[in-house]
Structures are given as C-alpha cells and as structure tokens.
C-alpha cells in the first residue's frame, strides 16, 4: 500500500496543538446566572447543554474544495491532480456530496459506482473530512493534556482504549473527535507498551496471537522491565536503559517528548533509549525538510527517556557494530507501516536491512494499515527468510491502533488507520545440542 506522507500538513498541525497548553485556551465564564443554572442541572442530574464549540458531524462538515481551511482546499486540488476516477479512469473532477471528498470524474460516474454506494465508503470518507476539519476548528483541545506518573497502587488496564484512558486518568473522551485526535498520537507509544506490559491484551496461542517463541521473547523483555519482581537481575543490567529501535521512522520520530513519556509511565522502574533510524527520521520544522546528520543527534527528555536520531539505514550501523552487543532482554525492534511487500519500498527493506534485523536475534514487531497490507508483508518475509526466522505474533488487529480515519491522496477511496494490524518475528535461535 502506497501512502503519500506530507509532514507539513496534518501532522504538523497535530504537533502545534500538542505543544500548546489546553488550559491556556479554556475560557470560563463566572457569571452568576451560569452558576445558578449549573447548580440546578447538577441537582436534577441533567447533562450540561451542548456548547456551540462542541464538534459534531454537522458543524465539522465542509466539502474540501470549499473548505474554510486553505490546506484542505490545497489537498482537494492535489487529489484532483494525482488520483483517477475508479469508474472511468479519468481525472477526478467531482466531489462526493455525501462525504465532501473529491472521488469521481463526474456525477454520472459517481452514480454508476455501485461498489462505492453498496459498501457505504462515503461514510468513512465523511469521517476523514470531519476529523480533519475538527483539528483546524480552533476549539480547545483539553484531551491533549496528558496525565503524569501513575501511582504504584493503581493498575493500568490495557484491554482497550476506553479502559486505558480511564485507568490512566486521561481527560474524558466523550466524542469520536477527541478519540480520533488522541489515539493517532498515542498509537505509537501505547502499541509498544501494550506488547511489553505484563498485563498485555495479547494472549498465547491458540486463544491469542502470541506463539511459544513470542512468549519467550516477551518474557525476556519483561524480566528486565520489572526488576523489583526479579531480585536476581544483575546490577549492570538494571543500570542499562532498554533500547527500542524504530526503523524507517517518520511521523513517530516527530512526536513530542511528553507523548512518548506515556510509554515510560507504564514502566516506572525502567529507563528507555528510543533510537529513530532512517533517512526521514530527523525533520527540521524551521526548514520544513528532512535533514541528514553524520553523527547521532541526541535529545534527552528527562533522566528516564532519551531520543537518538540516526539518519541512515539500519544495516550501515549494524555493519559498523554501533549497537553491539544486542541483548534480547534489553533490545526490541519496531517497524511501523514499513511496506516490506510494497513495490516502492521492497528493495530497501528485503535485502541487507532484513538480514541485519534477523541477525540481532531480538524481537521485531511490525504494523500495517490494514490486514492485507500486514499479511502481504509477513508472507514476503516468510517466503524469503522462512528458514532463518521464528514467528512471534500472528497478524492480528491492534488493540491500540489509531481510531482516526485517513485517506490516500493518490486514491481517495483507499482509507486506512495507522497501526491497524500488528505482527512479530525474530531471527531464529538455535539451541545448543550436547554431543555424546
């Protein structure tokens, strides 16, 4: 699946919103009449009246080519330039009145597209539309005010987003707009945390996706993550930060530190180094471009969390032994939407990079935009390196995938969610055989 990624658009808007304190934008009226009405509503157990600023599908819907947002009008123009009508194969010149997104060459082609109407694809496209307009609405975003350290007497529930938010004391997510905004950002750190956590929602085969080899890898990592439960853990190991390698990093490398801190809060006894690796991992907002660095760029969030950016391919650092020695108790790898099977990125992943990954013998987890996207990736790895790898986790729906719908500007009817499916594998370990 080929997705056009533009960090200067919606992603940059997210980072702008995340860096602003939501409480600085909340304006509270203290008029006596409002206090009195609030008291009456509370006494009667009534819900407060909706605010005109509250997002709804009605007040967030605008056709993109008539949008009050300049960048959405530009995006509509980009779709018309890049995409083709699924019915006629011609340029797209017609905006679907149900979704507000340019989708077909003409109204006649739109009416003829039986698959589009039968599948109600326009309903998902409408969600794409209203979510994007909500981000640009100027409303307060109190949902971006994330909680701090969890008390040791409080357990985190990782069954789903709702229970995670509740047990971590997040701002109450009452609308789909709030969920979409927050889950897109938190999907990366919480996907990692949900796999490594002792209360992970993923269980062992046959009831769950985790294989026996996967259980071994996760048990090794959890042995390190919970040192107080493993008194025999060597002091030298406890003093070393756990390394999380994210290969092919792009959007996840741009997340602010306080977003990634939500991962560290799940493991208060452990410090982390997050290594963002790849030619597009370092983005300079002032220059509006990706930059290269011949040396690692280090950013320390606090004493428990550090980012390291390396703007080359993983095999370069692997061959130079920059990360040696690897430790399956202390190191884990993630690739978010790598596109192993995609024609555009197949060559950069399935050669030296994949060989180097498998040589580490550490756990590798990967996500996909949808089930087919991830299944194609895993099947390709199996077909080329099947004898050199163990499957750790069968492809499964990611409990902590983003709930925000996105669309591909090159094919506006191709919709997806970030990190929708997840799977895992590792280079095969060979057990020592004692010879007689």
UniProtKB/Swiss-Prot annotation:
Note: Present with 4800 molecules/cell in log phase SD medium.
Gene Ontology terms describing biological process: mitochondrial cytochrome c oxidase assembly; mRNA processing; negative regulation of mitochondrial translation; positive regulation of mitochondrial translation; protein stabilization; RNA splicing
GO MF annotations, alphabetized: translation regulator activity
Species this protein is from: Saccharomyces cerevisiae (strain ATCC 204508 / S288c) (Baker's yeast)
Region (Disordered): 43-66
InterPro entries from the UniProt entry: Mss51-like_C, Mss51_Znf, Vps72/YL1_C
Major localization class: mitochondrion
The organism's place on the tree of life at top rank: Eukaryota
Protein role: Has a dual role in the assembly of cytochrome oxidase subunit 1 (COX1). It has a regulative function on COX1 synthesis, acting as a translational activator specific for the COX1 mRNA, and it also binds to newly synthesized COX1 protein. Together with COX14, may act as a chaperone that binds efficiently unassembled COX1 and prevents it from unproductive aggregation. When bound to COX1, MSS51 is unable to interact with the COX1 mRNA and translation is halted.
Protein name: Protein MSS51, mitochondrial
Subunit structure: Interacts with COX1 and COX14.
GO CC aspect terms: mitochondrial inner membrane; mitochondrion
Keyword Transit peptide: yes
Reported effect, residue 199 to I: Partially suppresses the respiratory defect of SHY1 mutants by increasing COX1 translation
Record: transit peptide: 1-26
Entry keyword annotation includes Transit peptide: yes
UniProt membrane topology term: Peripheral membrane protein
This protein's UniProt keywords: Membrane, Mitochondrion, Mitochondrion inner membrane, mRNA processing, mRNA splicing, Transit peptide
């Amino acid at each position: 699946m080929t997705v056009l990624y533009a960090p200067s658009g919606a992603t940059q808007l997210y980072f702008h919103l995340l860096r602003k304190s939501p409480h600085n934008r909340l304006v509270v009226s203290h008029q006596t009449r409002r206090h009195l009405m609030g008291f009456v509503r509370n006494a009667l157990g009534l819900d407060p009246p909706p605010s005109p600023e509250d997002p709804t599908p009605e007040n967030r819907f605008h056709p993109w080519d008539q949008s009050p947002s300049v960048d959405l009008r530009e995006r509509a123009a980009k779709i018309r330039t890049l995409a083709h009508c699924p019915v006629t194969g011609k340029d797209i010149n017609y905006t679907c009145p149900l979704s507000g997104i340019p989708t077909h060459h003409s109204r006649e082609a739109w009416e003829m597209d039986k698959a589009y109407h039968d599948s109600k694809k326009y309903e998902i496209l409408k969600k794409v539309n209203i979510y994007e307009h909500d981000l640009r609405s100027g409303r307060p975003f109190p949902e971006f005010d994330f909680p701090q350290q969890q008390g040791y007497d409080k357990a985190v529930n990782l069954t789903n987003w709702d229970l995670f938010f509740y047990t971590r004391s997040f701002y109450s997510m009452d609308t789909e707009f709030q969920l979409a905004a927050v889950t897109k950002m938190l999907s990366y750190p919480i996907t990692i945390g949900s796999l490594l956590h002792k209360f992970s929602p993923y269980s062992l085969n046959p009831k769950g996706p985790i294989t026996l080899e996967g259980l071994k890898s996760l048990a090794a990592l959890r042995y390190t993550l919970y040192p107080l439960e493993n008194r025999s853990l060597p002091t030298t190991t406890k003093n070393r930060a756990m390394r999380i390698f994210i290969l092919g990093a792009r959007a996840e490398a741009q997340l602010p530190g306080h977003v990634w801190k939500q991962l560290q809060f799940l493991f208060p006894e452990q410090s982390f180094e997050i290594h963002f690796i790849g030619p597009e991992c370092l983005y300079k907002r002032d220059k509006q471009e990706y930059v290269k660095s011949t040396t690692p760029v280090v950013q320390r969030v606090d004493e428990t969390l550090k980012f390291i950016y390396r703007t080359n391919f993983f095999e370069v650092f692997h061959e130079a032994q920059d990360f040696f020695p690897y430790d399956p108790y202390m190191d884990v790898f993630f690739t978010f939407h790598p596109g192993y099977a995609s024609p555009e990125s197949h060559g950069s992943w399935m050669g030296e990079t994949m060989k180097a990954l498998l040589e580490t013998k550490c756990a590798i987890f990967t996500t996909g935009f949808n089930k087919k996207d991830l299944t194609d990736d895993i099947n390709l790895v199996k077909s080329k390196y099947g004898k050199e790898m163990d499957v750790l986790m069968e492809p499964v729906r990611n409990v902590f995938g983003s709930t925000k719908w996105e669309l591909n500007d090159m094919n506006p009817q191709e919709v997806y969610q970030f990190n929708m499916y997840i799977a895992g594998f590792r280079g095969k370990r060979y057990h020592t055989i004692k010879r007689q």
